[in-house]
């Protein structure tokens, strides 16, 4: 049953910089954190990695693009899968990086160096079971979600975090959260439930009347190919700056859209025989269009000014790019001309003319690790996240 709202009481403190912990790590690096002794304990594995990684800095290569831009491998004290990165200030100096095995890293120099952070009231072995997948900030207010189901909230840029209890009646698992400021956030689950809180997670109000599964049961005769194979979950949920959403069915058979004010998600048929692999808003703007990647390396973009209220499928135009059959996992449309894509096999391509011509970035595919996510925090600074603690920085 889909619930319209739920109440969460007693936010639990997770960790705070105002406590004194077991280890002073100030002497271990040259980063700009001035008072490491006020931070929290570091488990054995993270501590050993943190001791070793400065000695390897000189071994990390730089990959140069024809336009004198470059991607540089950032040394990290972890070997986990990295899922998301976010900064708390307009200058993009102070930020957080999250991933599997309880990975929670902090930077104060724009992403050049990262320091591991550990929750003070969680056992180190327990923390390693968490997989932090998404982080979002609006000013100094931030939110983190992960699996097993967990929601964290901060109102001071990450100095102190609180754990928000997750209702056992929540349809699906949290998969995306967007900080809105003033103790507000929007939470989406793998079942298509969307909730908004205006009091730091104590209460949540549903924005849709039913889950995607229920919607498809009503519209199964609508002609949406693949809807009958829906497993009940969606992947790759994307929200743009206007609060509009895209979501892909777990099999990639079709996609769905939602915008504020609608009672349910609208399923839409794909226009190709290949399954959808990934989607996103171009420059995070609904008016710019949508991009879609399909299995085997297909890439297309929609026409502009499409109607989210219409039940018709959107029109897409193919972009000619030869990836050698490698699937396109993510894309970043930095501006009207500059496009970056990451593919299977650790391959990165760049176009500076709206996708007419593409250049492969040499050397990145030689690194140990797969690439999963590319994110530009502004027009001049971007990051690529991958497995084995692989983080690439562009500036």
Swiss-Prot record:
Annotated compartments: Plastid, Chloroplast thylakoid lumen
GO biological process, one term: photosynthesis
Transit peptide region: 1-28, 29-66
Keywords: Chloroplast, Photosynthesis, Photosystem II, Plastid, Thylakoid, Transit peptide
Example of a GO cellular component annotation carried by this entry: photosystem II
Gene3D superfamilies for this protein: YVTN repeat-like/Quinoprotein amine dehydrogenase
Domain of life the protein comes from: Eukaryota
Assigned protein family: Belongs to the Ycf48 family.
Domain commentary: A 7-bladed beta-propeller torus, about 54 by 55 Angstroms, with a depth of about 25 Angstroms and a central pore.
NCBIfam families in the cross-refs: PRK13684.1 (NF010237)
Function noted in UniProt: Essential for photosystem II (PSII) biogenesis; required for assembly of an early intermediate in PSII assembly that includes D2 (psbD) and cytochrome b559.
PANTHER family: PHOTOSYSTEM II STABILITY/ASSEMBLY FACTOR HCF136, CHLOROPLASTIC, PHOTOSYSTEM II STABILITY_ASSEMBLY FACTOR HCF136, CHLOROPLASTIC
Name of the protein in its database record: Photosystem II stability/assembly factor HCF136, chloroplastic
């Amino acid at each position: 049953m889909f619930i319209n709202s739920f109440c969460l009481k007693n936010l639990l403190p997770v960790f705070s910089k105002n406590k004194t912990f077991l280890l002073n790590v100030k002497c271990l690096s040259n980063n700009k954190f001035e008072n490491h002794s006020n931070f929290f304990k570091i488990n054995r594995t993270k501590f050993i990695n943190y001791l070793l990684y400065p000695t390897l800095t000189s071994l990390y290569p730089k990959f140069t693009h024809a336009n004198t831009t470059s991607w540089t491998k950032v040394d990290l004290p972890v070997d986990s899968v990295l899922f998301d990165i976010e900064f708390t200030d307009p200058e993009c100096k102070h930020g957080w990086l999250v991933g599997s095995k309880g990975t929670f890293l902090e930077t104060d120099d724009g992403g050049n160096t990262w320091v591991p952070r550990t929750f003070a009231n969680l056992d180190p072995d327990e923390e390693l079971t968490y997989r932090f997948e998404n982080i979002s900030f609006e000013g100094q207010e931030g939110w983190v979600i992960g699996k097993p189901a967990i929601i964290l909230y901060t109102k001071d840029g990450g100095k102190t975090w609180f754990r928000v209890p997750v209702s056992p009646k929540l349809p699906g698992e949290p998969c995306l959260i967007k900080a809105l400021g003033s103790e507000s956030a929007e939470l989406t689950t793998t079942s298509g439930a969307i909730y908004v809180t205006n009091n730091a997670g104590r209460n949540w109000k549903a924005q849709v009347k039913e889950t995607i599964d229920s919607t498809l049961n009503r519209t199964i005769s609508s002609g949406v190919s693949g809807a009958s194979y829906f497993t009940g979950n969606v992947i790759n949920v994307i929200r743009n700056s206007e609060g509009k959403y895209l979501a892909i069915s777990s099999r990639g058979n079709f996609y769905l859209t939602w915008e504020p004010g609608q009672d349910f998600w609208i399923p839409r048929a794909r226009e190709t025989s290949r399954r959808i692999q990934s989607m996103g808003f171009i420059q995070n703007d609904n008016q710019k269009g949508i991009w879609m990647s399909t299995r085997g390396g297909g890439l297309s973009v929609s026409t502009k000014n499409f109607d989210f209220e219409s039940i018709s499928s959107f029109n897409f135009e193919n972009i000619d790019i030869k990836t050698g059959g490698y699937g396109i996992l993510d894309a970043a449309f930095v501006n009207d001309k500059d496009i970056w894509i990451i593919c299977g096999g650790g391959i990165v391509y760049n176009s500076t003319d709206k996708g007419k011509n593409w250049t492969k970035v040499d050397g990145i595919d030689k690194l140990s690790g797969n690439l999963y996510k590319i994110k530009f925090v502004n027009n001049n600074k971007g990051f690529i996240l991958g497995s084995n603690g692989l983080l690439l920085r562009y500036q």
